[in-house]
């Protein structure tokens, strides 16, 4: 499939998914602050057990969504990253520089702001990575509202930036949010990875064997202490993109099959399950607490400063150029939109502040929702204003 048609399909799916995410989050907030809140919380706490022989996995429904279904989301991210690295925007070093610099700035500055506001509280510092994330579906959904007033190059810049950001989130989760490790489970996971790599090298193109071993890998990683969603990324990196014969690409086949399910099912379900913040007892002072404040300011101000600042620096030093047809006002608007952390921030928050085990569980959602909403509204307004006269400013 040509790059442009692949990007167009990706953008349309992500944009529509972003709008659906908004609806799912609003619905969760309404239900959990209504007389039906008992039903909402009871449903998420429902125990679900999967057992095959002596192997038993028992978790509440919420964790099946966060550990199980989100592994498919990370599988999709892994497929997208591999495709982009081998045959897309990330395969061309000259096109990586600008979004790469922007992504690095967009992760470092929010983390520093959160650290500064919470530096005297070691327990709160566990949430430092929450404002480093960008919700690509939500951000592209807002950008899609501007239609053709925004150049395709700017949309591609945001998409590439967000993919690099997701890759950074994967590394952060693997290094900083793993529990106590099980040597046996890690050994079995390593054996699964070796089998996947061997199949790739031997030219196996049928998806069935990859998915079966991938499921076993997920169970091993789940039991190992490393977060289970990383099994999805590992599986994705082992699925071949190219084939020796004229057979369809296994990677593209799986990506195209999985994308609608993730965009229209898994992500909205995750948003519904995790965005239901109870507003009972919440006051203005609640939002000024150092944890939600650090997250909200990190997302809104940190992302803007980091993304725009590193983009400006890369262009001014001559190592990169502005996206074709875009102006600095539009770049500023996109930088603000990168502060929409939402699903990715909620996911990292669920690892940093485990519900029922951390006093800050729930506070993170206040900061995420506040920062993301303001980033969406302000980012849209700035991008719309800058797009009225869509001419590139001198760089």
Swiss-Prot record:
Catalytic activity reported: Na(+)(in) + 2 H(+)(out) = Na(+)(out) + 2 H(+)(in)
Cell compartments where the protein resides: Cell inner membrane
Keyword set, alphabetical order: Antiport, Cell inner membrane, Cell membrane, Ion transport, Membrane, Sodium, Sodium transport, Transmembrane, Transmembrane helix, Transport
Ranges that cross the membrane: 11-31, 61-81, 96-116, 127-147, 156-176, 179-199, 215-237, 262-282, 295-315, 334-354, 366-386
Gene3D superfamilies in UniProt: Na+/H+ antiporter like domain
An example molecular function term from Gene Ontology annotations: sodium:proton antiporter activity
Disulfide bonds: none
Keyword Cell membrane part of the UniProt annotation: yes
Any one Gene Ontology cellular component term annotated for this protein: plasma membrane
Pfam annotation, one family: Na_H_antiport_1
Superkingdom assignment: Bacteria
Protein's UniProt keywords contain Plastid: no
Membrane-protein topology: Multi-pass membrane protein
Similarity annotation: Belongs to the NhaA Na(+)/H(+) (TC 2.A.33) antiporter family.
PANTHER family linked: NA(+)_H(+) ANTIPORTER NHAA, SODIUM ION/PROTON ANTIPORTER NHAA-RELATED
Function according to Swiss-Prot or TrEMBL: Na(+)/H(+) antiporter that extrudes sodium in exchange for external protons.
The protein's name in its UniProt record: Na(+)/H(+) antiporter NhaA
Gene name tied to this protein: nhaA
